[in-house]
């Protein structure tokens, strides 16, 4: 569809089964309570398998032992993933100590996983520990509400901007947006926190009785850092400051990376500029975007239900006009803004009020005590003495924020003694993977377990061509749902089958261009052979300051994706 020939505002047809499930769930209650008390299975059955996602959990099993258990006539080893709601990634040291203890005492893997949704996940929670984890979170002022399924997910906010004062203001807006768009149902409190049922009827004035057509992701971003990868998200508020003070936001809508292998109706898409709005209209505009997508999003086909598809179907101007109508405003022209990078600034950075921030590189966000590198113990020891907070970044790293000068040496010593400040090359700092095997049920190929050794080999190629300190934004995602954000990388690997990936090239360093598929269904040796040749050319032929992705486009190695709805698959 073009802007001149927009499609229908509402897609008619038989609703997907997920819509039935939501409608019949009694505002997300289902029969979860009954399932919790069923000791015959380690999992949740029927609709509850999906309903628990609205409560921040996914049912998984250990795929490494799935076949072995099947041979023994045993059900899969079911366990839950829980994702915390943590707007802007800010967590207190008291909260950190509580989650550290829970991970050690009550999860199969004993780890804390930082994610690129700027929060943490527990993997391997047995059914008997599901209620206790929600109660533990509640006891320290946290929850897992609306971190999965068809709601506004965890709201991201730039972690380590150049203006600390601006971060404080932007972070407050991230929290306000998150709270404003939360579901109003009391199901979460009743089921997990044993709060009494109230006689009043549930209402969902913003999300509606069947919630959103699909997942919905929101960011608050402070230029020039695009660390939160705004183009992966449905709704983005780009902070505009005057004299160091936040005055309003540019709004960008309709980003999203998930695709389905071979389904040409799916595509990755960057977000579109709508306009500028003063601060006082922020919540009204956020609500208007969400309710427009609620009413116009495709509820017949979940593969085509995200905001990016709604925007393409009805046309950008039509969607924008509806948001203006609902919010009661007219967007002003976009204010100037520019992004220069999206990696974290590893190491010490000076903030305001003589406070320091220490960004620690955590490979794939996995916090665990490794032989010779007791990362988890180190962070616990820092949490015990640190007077500021921790910030999780959208690059799966951790910031020890607001460290006074008097504590700096002590915290650095703890970090170094526990392997948290080991030297890594720029390539490793700019590489990322989703979890994938063994816990993700959707995984088609390895990602987190594949990345460290693969990065070693890419570093060797950079060294071979005389550019050991260069970096290429590299992402590995275990399936086309794209949690690893490979569709905004300069080198993106998308899992196709065990040991096989689609290789995408042509993204850029700042994350504003979708990469195109260069080779399909290839093995690691084939990938490395291609990269060896292309990185060799980049080292010799690049212009000053030219990133690898920009080089592959300029040199004609790959055609840029300019209009994803039409040319993503070409």
UniProtKB/Swiss-Prot annotation:
The keyword 4Fe-4S applies. Keywords: 4Fe-4S, Amino-acid biosynthesis, Cysteine biosynthesis, Heme, Iron, Iron-sulfur, Metal-binding, NADP, Oxidoreductase. SUPFAM superfamilies: Nitrite and sulphite reductase 4Fe-4S domain-like, Nitrite/Sulfite reductase N-terminal domain-like. GO terms for molecular function: 4 iron, 4 sulfur cluster binding; heme binding; metal ion binding; NADP binding; sulfite reductase (ferredoxin) activity; sulfite reductase (NADPH) activity. One of its GO terms (cellular component) is sulfite reductase complex (NADPH). InterPro entries: CysI, NiRdtase/SiRdtase_haem-b_fer, Nit/Sulf_reduc_fer-like_dom_sf, NO2/SO3_Rdtase_4Fe4S_dom, NO2/SO3_Rdtase_4Fe4S_prot, NO2/SO3_Rdtase_4Fe4S_sf, NO2/SO3_Rdtase_FeS/sirohaem_BS. HAMAP family: CysI. Alpha(8)-beta(8). The alpha component is a flavoprotein, the beta component is a hemoprotein. This is Sulfite reductase [NADPH] hemoprotein beta-component. It comes from Salmonella agona (strain SL483).
